[in-house]
């Protein structure tokens, strides 16, 4: 904890010093999100607690840009997750300190190229096509893609290998009429003839034009992230999604699939979502549902999750929210379903 505090202070002072020398080139930024509630996912016992990351995983860090002239810029991102309920760094105990971002790059008319740890191909398409965004607590789509329960194991998830990749080369294209693409390549850095050449590769596409947004991604992963970076069974996954803003309501939909070749396993997930702005207020009602079918040979199981919520902005940077969630699996086990309810506050800086 002392080391965490010392690191935070050092980086904050450095950012302040650099900002004074080159105005707005370096920024200390982040989000703090805490909630209180009673949580029970399928297969688990009920827990009443204060938690971190109700709608957004809490994070902080430093970002910077230097204008090199001729339209070329250098930039860097060094950002870290933390648990606001305890002040502990990381999303979990073994999480690397700068597990959100640790990369440096060059950007220009050609797009951007960066080296280091950054987003995996699955992240942006997933969070842009569901009303609860990047919530690892109440977004049905994000939960089915990334989060296990006592009744729903890692092999039943639809994300190949975490929402961020280490040892990565990332190329981001400029916008072509509202269409952007990101090409990801993670070196496996493995030795030995059996594991040589193991790697993660992926691509995503995002289109935005007027009320319509479309996304898609593909990943083929052989390297675990973010801790051990060990070789894992080859897993491939893809998803297509979109949203349309009718002004009175915004609709979301996704469909995706994941396969683990060594197990002959196939996981299929689809989701629907809805945002309804409350007229005359800075508030929005949210509803989302996701269903995943996991099949191994002739054996299959399903998971269904539904969330209903309300998000109210007190300012451009601060909002409060309330969410209720239902989670259920089809297997014949104790506690096969669960309900959760929480209220929280989120502040961006």
Regions from the language model: what does each represent?
Residues 1-25:
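Cleavable N-terminal export/targeting peptides
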Residues 24-38, 47-188, 197-199, 206-210:
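Outer membrane beta-barrel
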Residues 30-36, 78-80, 117, 183-185, ...:
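Transmembrane beta-barrel strands of outer-membrane/channel proteins
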Residues 36-44, 82-88, 121-125, 189-193, ...:
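Gram-negative outer-membrane beta-barrel proteins
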Residues 56-60, 100-106, 165-169, 199-203, ...:
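Hydrophobic, lipid-facing positions within transmembrane beta-strands of outer-membrane proteins
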Residues 68, 72-74, 110-114, 178-181, ...:
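Repeated loop/turn-to-beta-strand initiation elements of outer-membrane beta-barrel proteins
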Residues 196-307:
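Detector for outer-membrane/organellar transmembrane beta-barrel domains
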Residues 312, 337-349:
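Outer-membrane beta-barrel "beta-signal"
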């Amino acid at each position: 904890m002392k080391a965490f505090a010392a690191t935070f202070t050092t980086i904050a002072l450095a950012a302040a010093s650099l900002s004074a020398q080159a105005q707005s080139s370096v920024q200390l930024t982040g989000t703090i999100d805490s909630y209180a509630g009673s949580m029970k996912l399928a297969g688990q016992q009920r827990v009443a607690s204060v938690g971190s990351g109700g709608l957004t995983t809490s994070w902080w860090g430093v970002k910077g840009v230097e204008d090199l002239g001729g339209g070329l810029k250098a930039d860097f991102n060094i950002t870290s997750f933390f648990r606001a309920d305890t002040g502990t760094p990381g999303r979990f105990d073994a999480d690397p300190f700068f597990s959100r971002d640790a990369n440096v790059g060059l950007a220009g008319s050609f797009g951007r190229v960066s080296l280091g740890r950054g987003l995996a191909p699955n992240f942006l398409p997933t969070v842009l096509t569901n009303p609860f965004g990047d919530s690892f607590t109440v977004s049905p789509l994000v939960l089915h893609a990334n989060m296990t329960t006592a009744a729903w194991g890692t092999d039943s998830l639809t994300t190949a290998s975490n929402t961020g990749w280490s040892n990565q080369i990332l190329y981001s294209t400029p916008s072509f009429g509202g269409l952007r693409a990101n090409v990801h390549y993670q070196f496996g850095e493995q030795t030995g003839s059996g594991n040589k050449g193991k790697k993660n590769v992926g691509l995503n596409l995002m289109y935005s034009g007027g009320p319509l947004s479309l996304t898609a991604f593909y990943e083929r992963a052989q390297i675990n992230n973010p801790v051990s970076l060990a070789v894992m069974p080859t897993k491939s996954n893809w998803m297509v999604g979109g949203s349309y803003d009718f002004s009175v309501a915004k609709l979301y939909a996704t469909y995706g699939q994941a396969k683990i070749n060594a197990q002959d396993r196939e996981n299929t997930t689809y989701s629907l979502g809805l945002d309804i702005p409350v007229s005359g207020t800075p508030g929005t009602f949210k509803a989302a549902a996701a269903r995943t079918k996991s099949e191994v040979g002739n054996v299959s199981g399903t998971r269904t999750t539904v969330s209903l919520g309300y998000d109210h902005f007190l300012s451009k940077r601060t909002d409060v929210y309330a969410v209720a969630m239902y989670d259920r699996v089809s297997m014949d086990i104790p506690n096969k379903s669960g309900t959760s309810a929480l209220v929280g506050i989120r502040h961006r800086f």
